[in-house]
């Protein structure tokens, strides 16, 4: 997740053509509705700049094109990636684009499982932002290799494709190698595009339709994944592919509840010592109540404006005090690394950007775009000005559970921005058919079957599981690769309660 740079956010909001912005912020003092705010605030007409691209010829003869059987305006380009050229992995790989006419082009990279690709599950991985590339997951967290300082791949023995085939999709439009003339600035629109991609993918790989299929991601994927799963449940009731579960790591899914847990996390109630003074903690605690009122107005409104205001206030009041400490918003244990990419705090992400901009890498993958960036500010700004970040998506998690589709909410317990306290809280308050039974379950130790070490805490009832992972920040696979792999292997094997098999029935 690319956290909101507070100066950047405030500059954007000040650019709104409104004579007295303070008049809008006076609403924070009471529970006044936003009945007249639509007339008072005027959003810029163009909140997302047109992409400036250096494009290659996408009529590349190395691509095979599959035309959608449902809508011929959509197609999927597919090419084999020679594993020996890049050395990311030795397994079979494909890359390409989903195209919509000449206006939208979504890039993906697909890796077969290292184990049994004909029968192993398939996982779609999504990073967050909004506006950040899923190649962060591929080349920095959980993929077959990471990129070293010498720009060479480093084999990852804990890759999630050890026992699953992995799809890394660059979405929404404008992220990474994806491009187009249209603008996508809401989770709802992004979800529709991702769903169509999945339909086309399984048309191109029909032998995989019966395999278990999981959607996984982190951070802002806590928005994306519920929306995509909702699209599948609503539009694909006969399941032309087999949606088996979803997994969300350190996600932002229910902003109203999660915002209440910044102060506890910063002030010593999340298992780590306080990083703010008692005075700052008291001030933040008071601000949380005001943030909650604004988020309630956002949830109740059909307009984006209350959500934009909620985002601006809550981030200023609840993120800025923490950011001023100099600590990493993704890992409360220390500051950002030196020489890291802008706003992302990790030097290794700079290596990924450099690697993906090598002409030989782009040529091997068949990219239509020469300029790669791990996070796109235009996409981020577009989502900001729809208020998307403050909108709720937990209702679609309830929909999945009520359809008996398993959901895993996992969280590294040293993250601040999407911390484990907030994720535990919203999952506990989720309205679904077995809410009360789930609430009665207590967190219990999650113990490694490999080492016998306690890796975290787990809570489960039926299809719903919450997992706290010790000593991991925002990106669990990066901080705890062994635990991350054990987690995903257990989950996709059907052990939803993360229990010893002898006690699994009682635990679930």
UniProtKB/Swiss-Prot annotation:
Note: Present with 1420 molecules/cell in log phase SD medium.
The protein's name: Vacuolar serine-type carboxypeptidase ATG42
Organism: Saccharomyces cerevisiae (strain ATCC 204508 / S288c)
GO process terms (BP): cellular response to nitrogen starvation; macroautophagy; phytochelatin biosynthetic process; zymogen activation
Effect noted on mutating residue 415 to A: Leads to partial block in enzymatic activity
Keyword Signal annotated: yes
Gene (name only): ATG42
Binding site for substrate: 418, 475
Signal sequence, start to end: 1-24
PROSITE patterns per UniProt: CARBOXYPEPT_SER_HIS, CARBOXYPEPT_SER_SER
The protein's Enzyme Commission number: 3.4.16.5
Active site annotation, chain numbering: 219, 415, 474
